Each structure stands twice: as structure tokens, then as C-alpha cells.
Amino acid sequence: VKYWLTFNEINSSVAPMGALLNQGILNDLENPTVFMEQPDIPQQRFQGLHHMFVASALAVKMAHEIDPEYKVGNMMIYAASYPLTCNPKDVLVCQKYNRLYNYYCADVQAYGAYPAYADSLLKEMGVVLEKEAGDEEILKNGTVDFITFSYYMSSCQTADSKEKSGEGNILGGVLNPYLKASDWGWQIDPEGLRYPFSTTISGK
């Protein structure tokens, strides 16, 4: 085996559900199986994600030391998202969503450093990352060799809170009027699968 992955769907950690599903953090011991209703603590969640970035980088470095021919990638859930309208407010909301859900993890793991937009995203959520000495060097020296992703559906983003949310969409978003939905509420978008091939990293 020459191709390896570190964490599965690592970017699910940017969503509240990711604390339990991706990091194993359980804040409500009385209701351990109701993961969508677990109390969300962004500081805890993004700090955990930082540790995952460091662990992934160390794994990449170790794999290359074991066998220089090994290739190690990351793995994300790609949340294809479009502005609901051409209203500039919708476009900006969608840009912010894509940065958080689709670019944040890939940028750190592919470039080996936090992107410039990370500061404003984290500040808005009240998150201040605690970094250990050497973390930045570890990230820099442990970049992934390739990017992989899973894809299920797409959604639209809007600044209008009155729009109807997509049923079954655990990553957030509203219904796309141009798409049909499955029986469980996920909108069917085969074209959306083409989208990530040019947009999984921000390009800085």
C-alpha cells in the first residue's frame, strides 16, 4: 500500500456536529446519542481541529521517513455551495461559507500554514487558538501529497433568513430552486461534483 489518508472528512470539525462525530467530544453526558443537540463550544472544537492538523502533519512526515514513495493525503467532505441569488450579500455569505467548510482545512494541510482569512473567521466565533512551540514548523513540514473528498449534495447560501433550509442538510444551506431532492431531502446535483476539482484550495 502506497497511498494513505490521515483523518476522514476532517473538515466536518468546522460544523457543530463535528465535535462528537469527528473529534469524539461529548459535552452532554445525559444525551450522548443526540449529536445534533450537543452543546457547541467553538473554542473547544477548533482547538481540537488544530491538534488534528498537527497530528496529520506528523503522520505525513513519519510516512515519508518510513518509505519515501508513500503518498499521504487528507480527506474532506466537499460541501458544494452556491449563492442563492446574485445579490452581493448572498455572494459574500457564500464566500464565507466556502472558506470555512471547503478551504480552511485544505489550505492548512496543503500549504502548511493557516490562511490569511482564518484570523477573521476564528475571531468572529470567539476562537483563540493555543499553539504549542513547534506547531507551525510541524505544519510547514507535513503538508499532504494530495487532496481527497467525499461528495453528497450541494446547497445554496443566502443572507435572507426567511429562506427555507434544505431538509436533511446537516452542513447548512437553503434549497436550490433548480434542483430536485431525494426522498430524504438531499438535493441531487451531479454537476456539483465537478466544482471541487478547481476549488478545494483557495489559491491564497
Label each PLM-derived region with a short phrase.
Residues 1-204:
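Active-site region of glycoside hydrolase catalytic domains
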